[in-house]
């Protein structure tokens, strides 16, 4: 498969509700989106004028018609802000709230779905009862347009305590690489932590398992959720939490692509690159792209 445009970087995303997008989209999330940040609609969405398998400007929601803000939103925004102006970024998001990693097992997903509650079965129907195959089909279509550069995952809450989870995710990753004729060293796996213990995350113990992934998958990179604000259920992130987490996915990916993705706080202060309304705490600051410097600058207050 030969890509039509090597400067169109495509990222596959899958997982459960935090990748699907649980927070309400706020006004700021639908403005200032670059024409270089695109999403491939994973399903038909007539009310938004979207057709499955077609590219659109990445206005949220990026999963299905009525989902919310996702890490993909600010992953893509941050990427295009920091990549050369000739590079476009596209995301394909197939995520199902409440699912276990077993739902993406290409060999046994049918048996797994049979054991699940009706509400999950109804969501899975949107993906023809096989989200893995659905994602692969979309990815193959996308490969006619650009180059798959990475795979983003946020899943684990429904597998909390499952010590075999890293191996199960490894199987999904390796299947994707094989089915799409990709090389692991060219397509890293970026996996976000669930809501952190510092936010009283009810599944925070799963992060101990997630953090072992690089020992199982040499091309896996764990994205910290520390400090990312949680919603009242302590299971999902707030909109601000998704913005922060998405930017962290991008920071890691930019580094892997060879870009200096962050400069230190003192230099950021000296350069006076700030938002008009500074973050209340440094950890809340979001990246300000500077493609010419090849850097991602954070502005905020202590």
Language-model-derived ranges and their functions:
Residues 4-261:
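Cell-envelope and extracellular/periplasmic
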Residues 263-302:
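Aromatic-residue-lined binding/catalytic grooves and analogous aromatic/hydrophobic interfacial grooves
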């Amino acid at each position: 498969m030969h890509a039509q445009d090597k400067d169109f970087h495509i990222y596959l995303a899958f997982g459960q509700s935090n990748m699907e997008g649980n927070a309400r989209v706020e006004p700021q999330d639908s403005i200032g989106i670059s024409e270089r940040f695109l999403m491939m609609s994973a399903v038909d969405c007539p009310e938004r004028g979207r057709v499955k398998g077609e590219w659109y400007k990445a206005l949220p929601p990026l999963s299905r018609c009525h989902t919310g803000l996702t890490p993909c939103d600010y992953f893509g925004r941050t990427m295009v802000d920091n990549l050369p102006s000739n590079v476009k970024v596209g995301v394909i998001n197939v995520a199902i709230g409440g699912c276990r990693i077993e739902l993406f097992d290409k060999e046994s997903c049918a048996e797994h779905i049979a054991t699940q509650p009706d509400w999950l079965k109804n969501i899975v129907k949107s993906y023809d009862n096989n989200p893995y195959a659905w994602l692969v089909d979309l990815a193959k279509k996308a490969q006619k347009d650009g180059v798959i550069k990475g795979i983003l995952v946020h899943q684990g809450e429904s597998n909390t305590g499952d010590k075999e989870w890293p191996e199960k995710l490894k199987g999904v990753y390796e299947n994707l690489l094989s089915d799409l004729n990709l090389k692991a060293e060219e397509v890293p796996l970026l996996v976000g932590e669930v809501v952190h213990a510092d936010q009283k995350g009810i599944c925070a113990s799963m992060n101990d398992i997630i953090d072992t992934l690089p020992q199982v998958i040499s091309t896996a990179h764990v994205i910290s959720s520390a400090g990312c604000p949680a919603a009242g259920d302590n299971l999902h992130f707030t909109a601000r939490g998704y913005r922060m987490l998405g930017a962290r996915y991008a920071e890691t990916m930019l580094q892997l692509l060879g870009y200096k993705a962050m400069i230190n706080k003192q230099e950021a202060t000296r350069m006076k690159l700030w938002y008009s309304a500074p973050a209340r705490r440094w950890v809340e600051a979001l990246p300000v792209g500077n493609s010419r410097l090849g850097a991602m600058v954070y502005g905020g207050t202590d």
